[in-house]
Amino acid sequence: ITIYELHLRYYYQGLAYSGFPYVYHTVGSAFAVKALSYVKAGGMNRKQAGEDFYFIQKLVSSGGYFNMNSTTVYPSPRASSRVPFGTGASIGKLSAYQNSTLFTYNFLAFKELGIFFGLIDRFFECRPDELDGHFNLIPHGLRLFLNEKEWIEKLTEIKNNTAGIHSFKKRFFAWFNMFMIVKYLNNVHLVYFEKKSVEVSASELLEARGIIFESREPLDFLLYYRAMEKNG
C-alpha cells in the first residue's frame, strides 16, 4: 500500500508540475460535495468502476473546491478483483509477487504536458490558419496522441467561441481535462515512453524541482510527498 499511495501522490505532483489548473486526487479520494454542486455537475454516474474519477473531473472545473489537511484518510491495503484497476486491483497484483515493484508514468510525460500547457497563450494569439504550424511545437509524444486535423478543428472551435484568454483557457481545459490526460498517459506509454518504477519517477520529479533526495526507500519518499502536498 505504501508503493501504491506513493504512485497516487506522484501522479498528483506530476499534474501540478505540468501546470494543469485542476489538480485533485481522483482515485482513492475521500470527498464531500454540496447537493447543489452535485446536481449542477450532473450527478454521479452508475458505472461499476471509476465513478469517482468521472464525477470529480466534471466537478473541479467549476472551482470552489479545497483540500482538508486537518485529518488523514489512508487507502485500505485490501486486495480486490471487483474492477481491473484502482487500489484493490493494484494491491492484489503487488501482493501476488514477492519483492515486486509498481511501474508508473514516466516523468518525461508530465514534462511534455508542461510544455503543451505553456503553449496555450500562443494558441490563443495565433490566427486559425497558423494552427497547423503551431501543432509542430507540441512535444512528440502528444503529437502521437492528438490527431492534427481534429486538434485544429477543436482549437478553431474554442477560438471562435471565446473573446479573451481567460475564457479560452477555461474551454481548453474543459476539453483537455483529467480524462484526456489519463488517455494521453496511457497511450504515450504504449508507443513512446517506458514506464519506470515509482521510486525512480518520484526521485526524478523531485530532482526537476531542485530537490536532491538521498533515500531510495518508498516509505521515505511517501512521507516527503505527503508533506509536499500538505504544505502546498
Q: What positions do the PLM features span?
A:
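Acidic donor-binding loop at a coil-to-helix junction in glycosyltransferase catalytic cores
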Residues: K47-Y54
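Conserved donor NDP-sugar-binding/catalytic core segment of glycosyltransferases
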Residues: I1
